[in-house]
Amino acid sequence: MSTSAASLHPFVYLASQSPRRQELLQQLGVRFELLLPRPDEDAEALEAELPGERAHAYVQRVCVAKAHAARARLVAGGHAARPILVADTTVTIDDAILGKPVDADDAFAMLTRLAGRDHEVLTAVAVVDAEGTLLPAALSVSKVRFAALHAEAIRRYVASGEPLGKAGAYGVQGRAAEFIGHIDGSYSGIMGLPLFESAALLRAARIDF
């Protein structure tokens, strides 16, 4: 049975500061408004790892925690009740979780570890519908193969500033593209928002696009 246009939501709240996620939503033709953490929120605390936590469990737990935090933010702020989209991305190699580097030295160490090897990029996506129900989250898993890299190439890339603020210390859509020999999975998932999974969740939440 088709859903009438009157029952569709005109936009979704995006609980993310990532420019890449905003670009990807625009690619789908999804209208959105940002729902960002308040100054008094400790958003970074949500991304803290638990002892012994594996990457797949970690990224899904953090995504769900972000979803609950975003819903609480919406209610506390008195915003109109609309669905909320959240996502979390991490990189994993050797069972280690590589999140956002804390500084240039950390970025250099991460990229040195990835050089010449395969790793996984995991992006979990969740939607809280307008009634406040968390829909089943989706997980995108992609494998990425990096070329062997000399230390000087890594230093030049780190000096560009691009690695900071990105899981695994690189952006697939930026200068790091020259390092990537092979991808098995979702390019948009590696960017931070897998469009196949996200579109399905947004349609389930009755977003008009």
From Swiss-Prot:
Keywords linked to the UniProt accession: Cytoplasm, Hydrolase, Nucleotide metabolism
EC number(s) given by UniProt: 3.6.1.9
Reaction(s) catalysed by this chain's protein: dTTP + H2O = dTMP + diphosphate + H(+); UTP + H2O = UMP + diphosphate + H(+)
Record keyword Coiled coil present: no
GO cellular component labels: cytoplasm
Site location (Important for substrate specificity): 20, 89, 173
GO molecular function ontology, one term from the record: dTTP diphosphatase activity
Pfam families reported for this sequence: Maf
Residues at the active site: 88 (proton acceptor)
Location of the protein in the cell: Cytoplasm
Gene Ontology terms: biological process: nucleotide metabolic process
Cofactor(s) the protein requires to work: a divalent metal cation
Highest taxon of the lineage: Bacteria
UniProt family annotation: Belongs to the Maf family. YhdE subfamily.
Chain's role: Nucleoside triphosphate pyrophosphatase that hydrolyzes dTTP and UTP. May have a dual role in cell division arrest and in preventing the incorporation of modified nucleotides into cellular nucleic acids.
Record protein name field: dTTP/UTP pyrophosphatase
Species this chain originates from: Paraburkholderia xenovorans (strain LB400)
